[in-house]
Amino acid sequence: MSKERVAIILAAGVSSRMNTKLPKVLHEVCGRAMLAYVLDACRQAGVGSLYVVIGYGAEQVKKQFEGSKDITWVDQPEQKGTAHAVLCCKKHLKDFDGETLVLCGDGPLIRVATLKTLMEKHKTERSAATLATAVLDDPSGYGRIVRDTYGNIQGIVEHRECTKEQLAIKEVNPSYYLFNNKILFDFASKVKPDNVKKEYYLTDALSIMIAAGHKVTAVTAVLPEEAISINSRVQLSETGKIMQRRIQLELMNKGVTIVDPPNTWIDARAQIGQDTVIEPFTCIHGEVKIGRGCRIGPLAYLRSGTILKNGSYIKPGTVISQENMDESVRKGKKNVS
């Protein structure tokens, strides 16, 4: 394998708190599977090949992303922890002499800028491993970053393994790592399941690296919202609100007027032209294309497949689908089909 940068994305887990039959990473955030955001962030950050570790609902996940030629699917039949998931990729990457990004498929709020900062830090520090950290007001549930008196990272302690003093630490591990590939697999194989859950933690590999004298650095580059991993319907809803804000902010910066952002919902796949005005209580769902200088709503619902030409006017209360699109735009009548 040529020297490049690859990513291992952990997407095999089952979340009992989601109470769902659908694989967790296929739950949608603003119209897209949460895993899709992670894949795109890796691509935009310059990652060449993606190794996605799957387990529960593996065939469903593969079908959702069929046609993505940069993805190699890696099976993890039993979920024995993050280090075990990484080791499932060893047969594909054992001869790779580059950098391996490791992150989770249930963290769709990761930004490309954060991944690039992580990569730059890894390069300038010439580290064996680099992790991005976040500082949270409420660090409950997250692994804590333990540093010495000089600020050097000593390790990561999972929440349930923390002492009372460690629980007070607010710097946490959102699970974004960059490793020198051969060191990653060497030390992941040394991890033992010496914890409450009897799992193989990738965080333990970092502690073993440090004890062996390898340089491990951490960069506080993660916004608090990026640290959210979705493990419940409540977190799914919270993540959707944050993603919706990002979608609308990007559109407004491109010249779209959104009169009342909190009362407007726009799908991540929608395309909206400059100088279009979106009135309150409008929902734009699915792959919708809206031209320049349009006015939509209020109280309009545009279904997937809708295409509006430049200057279109959608009257209040209009429901548009691909089937009634021409009539709705021409007459501005209310449609309920």
Residue ranges and their predicted role:
Residues V25, D70-T72, N152, K215-T217, ...:
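Conserved beta-strand segments of alpha/beta enzyme cores
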Residues T257-S337:
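Structural signal for interior beta-strand "rungs" in well-ordered beta-sheet cores
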Residues R5, S49, K90, F187-A188, ...:
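Catalytic cores of nucleotide-enabled group-transfer and carboxylate-activating enzymes in metabolic
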Residues K69, I110-V196:
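Conserved core of the sugar-phosphate nucleotidyltransferase
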Residues Q154-Q244, L249:
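Catalytic-core segments of class I nucleotidyltransferases/pyrophosphorylases
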Residues S2-V6, R32-L103, L109-A113, T117-E120, ...:
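Conserved N-terminal catalytic core of the sugar/cofactor nucleotidyltransferase
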Residues M1-T20:
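N-terminal nucleotide-binding beta1-loop-alpha1 segment
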Residues K21-Y37:
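Short catalytic helix/loop segments, enriched in acidic residues and glycine
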